[in-house]
């Protein structure tokens, strides 16, 4: 019979947010210098292990083993500063009104591995500098606590309107 409450859980490395998936890192549990076995000596439960913040791991004795011990690990947000933002369209003709670009896709890196987001939950975007001819920008901003951090920017162009296909009409009048 083991008293798991006297056991030690080894340091659990920080993890990055995993796009809404539960993070369940492996743990090393020792008691009196002996490494215990998951499924034989104990079972593991996780709490608050999806969004950024502090997650809890609880190790509980099974069968005749009793007691429990807990530890924590941090879930870090994914930094979007270097995200690759692809716009549906990146060149627009001047209209005299604000022109807002639309996002086609966003690719971020988690632990150095690129991931294209299919859901932009936790991210908002706004456009600026988007009335006059020149460069306009779209800023993607991470919402607090939603898995991402910081901002990313994409630029797009507003070009002079062409008058080649313009139709001009005027009331008939005599000018002197």
Task: Locate the predicted segments by residue.
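Serine/threonine-rich, repeat-prone extracellular segments and beta-strand-based repeat modules
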Residues: 33-71, 112-150, 154-156
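Solvent-exposed, low-complexity, repeat-rich "mucin-like" stalks and linkers
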Residues: 1-34, 79-113, 159-176
């Amino acid at each position: 019979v083991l008293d798991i409450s006297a056991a030690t859980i080894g340091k659990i490395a920080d993890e990055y947010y995993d796009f809404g998936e539960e993070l369940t890192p492996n743990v090393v549990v020792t008691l009196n210098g002996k490494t215990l076995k998951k499924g034989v000596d104990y079972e593991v439960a996780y709490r608050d292990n999806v969004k950024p913040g502090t997650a809890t791991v609880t190790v509980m004795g099974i069968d005749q083993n009793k007691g429990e011990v807990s530890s924590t690990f941090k879930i870090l947000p994914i930094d979007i500063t270097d995200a690759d933002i692809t716009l549906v369209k990146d060149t627009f003709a001047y209209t005299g009104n604000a022109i807002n670009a639309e996002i086609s896709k966003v690719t971020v890196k988690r632990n150095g591995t690129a991931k294209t987001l299919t859901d932009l939950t936790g991210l908002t975007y706004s456009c600026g500098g988007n009335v006059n001819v020149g460069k306009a920008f779209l800023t993607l901003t991470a919402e607090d606590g939603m898995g991402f951090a910081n901002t990313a920017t994409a630029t797009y162009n507003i070009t002079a309107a062409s008058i080649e296909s313009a139709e001009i009409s005027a009331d008939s009048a005599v000018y002197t």
